[in-house]
Design a protein with these regions (language model features):
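Conserved blade-register residue in beta-propeller folds
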Residues: 65, 105, 162, 204-206
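Active-site cofactor/substrate anionic-group-binding motifs, chiefly glycine-
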Residues: 56, 60-89, 96
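Short loop/turn segments that connect beta-strands within beta-propeller blades
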Residues: 66-71, 107-111, 164-168
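Short consensus segments that form the blades of beta-propeller domains
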Residues: 149-153
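Sequence signature of WD/YWTD-type beta-propeller architectures
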Residues: 2-15, 65-66, 70-74, 80-81, ...
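Beta-strand-rich domains and repeat architectures in extracellular enzymes and scaffolds
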Residues: 2-16, 21-62
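Short C-terminal beta-strands that terminate individual repeats in beta-propeller domains
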Residues: 74-76, 115, 173
Length: 206
């Protein structure tokens, strides 16, 4: 957190959160110094096999790794200012890259596959966050970029998209957001209802 006067807390909006974490546990400060003026560290992703946490230090264009007992170390630099991170059903890393305006997947051999970089022939704005559903579909948010004037956007809206598991079909699910940001599925059933948070905070939508 950038403001030491703020008290961190977890706001539980649904009982299903208890399936993931205990909200009664105290919040522990692990590290700081990330993000800079452009925003905080984001995109946390727990890598179960290695027992470590990956996260995006967007402003510094790098991916960091937190290992319990060892602290924070550099995982990758540069990252095209990647933000949201997740894994697909095969365990491959999927990332939203700001600078390259695309969503990518890292293969087992380290090569990069482009999941999406355009819609109907127009470049994406600035992919922000990404999740994978139990059927393998990839969902991501694509808000407009504050670094470009509206007339310079290829897409004249901020969107929420779904890509099929074979990377063959990209569908626009919503285009009426101002700035769609975080994305998650509510763990109530296998139907997987996607929820998107909007910034500035106008609420959560599904």
């Amino acid at each position: 957190m950038s403001d030491n006067n703020l008290t961190p807390r977890i706001e539980q909006l649904a009982p299903e959160l208890e399936k993931i974490i205990s909200t009664s546990e105290p919040i522990e400060h692990l590290a700081d110094g990330f993000g800079g003026a452009q925003g905080p560290a984001e995109g946390p992703l727990w890598w179960k096999e290695g027992g470590y946490l990956l996260f995006s230090d967007i402003h510094n264009n790098r991916r960091m790794k937190y290992q319990p007992g060892s602290g924070v170390s550099l995982s990758l630099e540069p990252t095209n200012r990647a933000n949201g991170l997740t894994r697909d059903l095969q365990g491959r890393l999927v990332a939203c890259e700001h600078d390259s305006r695309r969503v990518t997947r890292q293969e087992a051999d380290g090569s990069i596959t482009v999941v999406a970089n355009s819609f109907q022939g127009r470049r994406l704005n600035r992919p922000n966050d990404v999740v994978v559903r139990s059927d393998g579909c990839i969902y991501f948010t694509d808000p407009w970029s504050s670094q470009a004037a509206p007339e310079q956007w290829d897409l004249q809206y901020s969107g929420v998209y779904r890509m099929t598991p074979d990377l063959g079909t990209l569908s626009l699910l919503a285009d009426d957001f101002v700035l769609p940001n975080g994305l998650a599925f509510l763990l109530i059933s296998d139907c997987g209802i996607p929820y998107a948070a909007e910034r500035p905070c106008h609420g959560n939508y599904r």
